[in-house]
Swiss-Prot record:
This is Putative esterase VNG_1336C. It is an enzyme of class 3 (hydrolase). Keywords: Hydrolase. Gene3D superfamilies: Hotdog Thioesterase (3.10.129.10).
């Protein structure tokens, strides 16, 4: 159980994102947050895309940033005192599955949080084009995060 009410978690994390230079520049929004789970979105914008071959495809570094951020926040949300605690990425793996041309949505789930290290798995999708279509998975990742507890 985390140290804050689940109803307030998304608003609290959104405030953190809004105060973070890079994350606010990217337009990151918190769609869902709970104990050990996180859903973040980055809206599509041409300033975040590749030029030349593949023009219009979201740059892979944007997906990697989203994977890193969602994983770290998911691990932090699983801690007894998530507001007082902190995490730092110690290992990040990203596998790109296909080009992304649209908003990116990351779903992160904690695999395990130990006394000093937490691990999360993250999937990044682009939303479906139509109501009857499925979202398209564009990248997957796994992050290991050093945990700095205050409990």
């Amino acid at each position: 159980m985390t140290g804050f009410d689940a109803d307030d978690a998304a608003a609290l994390i959104q405030s953190y994102v809004d105060d973070h230079g890079l994350l606010s520049f990217l337009g990151v929004s918190v769609e869902d947050a709970s104990d050990g789970e996180m859903r973040l979105r980055i809206p599509y914008h041409e300033k975040l895309t590749n030029h030349g071959p593949g023009e219009g495809d979201v740059h892979g570094g944007i997906a990697a940033t989203l994977i890193d951020t969602a994983g770290g926040l998911a691990v932090r949300s699983a801690l007894p005192k998530p507001v007082a605690a902190n995490v730092a990425t110690i290992d990040l793996n990203v596998s790109y599955l296909r080009p992304a041309r649209g908003d990116l949505i990351a779903d992160a789930s904690v695999v395990r949080v130990g006394s000093t290290v937490g691990v999360a798995e993250i999937s990044v999708v682009t939303p479906a084009d139509t109501a009857d279509a499925e979202p398209t998975e564009v990248a997957v990742g796994r992050g290991s995060f050093r945990v700095f507890r205050d409990d």
